[in-house]
Regions:
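Short acidic-glycine-tyrosine-enriched beta hairpin
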Residues: 84-100
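Ligand-binding loop in jelly-roll beta-barrel domains
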Residues: 100-124
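Glycine- and acidic-residue-biased ligand/ion/polar-headgroup-sensing regions
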Residues: 68-84
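A short, N-terminal "cap"/entry segment at the start of jelly-roll beta-barrel domains
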Residues: 1-47, 130-132
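Short beta-strand His + acidic residue motifs that chelate non-heme Fe in jelly-roll/DSBH
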Residues: 61-63, 81-82, 98, 103-109
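Short, charged, intrinsically disordered terminal tails
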Residues: 122-132
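Conserved short histidine dyad/triad with adjacent acidic residue
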Residues: 34-36, 46-66, 100
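A cytosolic small-molecule/anion-sensing beta-strand core signal
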Residues: 75-76, 91-92, 110
Length: 132
């Protein structure tokens, strides 16, 4: 298997270690911004989209949905993840799974880093998706 090149959305923060292995140093990407979370596309190879979010406490993603199944991993801090049917406070180390086409929102309770994986990549769907 060959590591896919940077996708059409820009350069990748991955560093190639060999023809089939690449690494991304997530702590080096940690940056915040005022007015909303900092969103960095890590990779979109058509199979999955991987995005990292850096939130300041109180920042949020308002209710939205995507045509992909999502996995949300809280790497640092704590956030609240809400759907119409449930709400949970997710601390660092939590992994949340959500089916496609389910409206949800996110609020950072503390400064927080969240890794989002969408599968398959929204590039394979016709529905609009959240753009990083």
């Amino acid at each position: 298997m060959t590591t896919p090149p940077a996708d059409d959305m820009g350069t990748t923060p991955f560093r190639s270690l060999s023809a089939d292995l690449a690494i991304c140093d997530l702590p080096k990407l940690e940056q915040y911004q005022e007015g909303g979370p900092r969103i960095t596309l890590l990779r979109d190879d058509g199979v999955a989209r991987v995005v990292v979010f850096h939130f300041r406490a109180g920042q949020q993603l308002p209710e939205h949905q995507t045509s992909s199944r999502i996995y949300v991993q809280v790497l640092r801090g704590m956030l609240t993840f809400r759907t119409a049917g449930a709400s949970t406070n997710a601390p660092a180390g939590s992994l949340l799974a959500l089916e496609a086409n389910v409206a949800h929102s996110v609020v950072a309770l503390t400064d927080c880093t969240m890794l989002l994986t969408l599968t398959p990549s929204p590039l394979r769907h016709s529905l609009p998706e959240m753009q990083p």
